Design a protein with these regions (language model features):
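Active-site proximal beta-strand in glycosyltransferases
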Residues: 6-7, 93, 110-126, 141
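N-terminal strand-loop element at the rim of the active site
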Residues: 7-74
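A short acidic, helix-capping loop that chelates divalent metal ions and anchors anionic groups
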Residues: 66-70, 124-129
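Membrane-proximal helix-turn-helix segments that form the acceptor-binding/catalytic region
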Residues: 80-83, 135-146
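Glycine-rich phosphate-binding loop signature in dinucleotide/nucleotide-binding domains
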Residues: 85-92
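Short His-centered aromatic/hydrophobic patch
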Residues: 96-102, 120
């Protein structure tokens, strides 16, 4: 029987999110074809591939997370990139990790015939405290959650 394909999308590939997503990919690789689309950050370990099972298919993203969720030109490029990755991988399930990948991914895959799961992890709007950026994230979470 053919394995189902899981596409993990992770912009915040560092710290606790890195540990969580790496372990999740490794735990799933026996039963699923796992694809990990990620963006490198300063917090990403230099030897990050050593933490991942060799059967995990790695896709480094160029546009996702470059400017967060507040730069329209960057966001459009990121959405196009996410749609191309989805087209290439043809996943059965897409699992979005953290706020930026969650926001852009839900925009990119809205209206598509995909099963999309979102895990926010750090809750960016809470960590930012009061202010304009925090309100944008809260609004985006509310709109995209429906």
């Amino acid at each position: 029987m053919k394995k189902k394909r899981i596409l993990m999308v992770c912009e915040a590939f560092g710290g606790g999110v890195f540990t969580y997503v790496s372990q999740l990919c490794n735990d799933m690789v026996d039963e699923f074809d796992v694809y990990l689309a990620y963006s490198l950050r300063p917090q990403t370990p230099k030897n990050y591939t050593d933490f991942l099972d060799q059967r995990v298919h790695l896709i480094e993203m160029e546009n996702v997370g470059v400017k967060g969720l507040t730069n329209l030109k960057s966001d459009i490029a990121a959405i196009k990139e996410l749609r191309q990755i989805e087209k290439d991988v043809q996943p059965d399930v897409i699992h979005l990790h953290s706020s930026v990948a969650g926001g852009l991914g839900r925009l990119a895959y809205k209206g598509k015939n995909n099963t999309v799961v979102y895990t926010p992890h750090g809750y960016a709007h809470i960590l930012m405290g009061p202010g304009k950026k925090s309100k944008i994230y809260k609004f985006a979470e509310k709109v995209l959650g429906n």
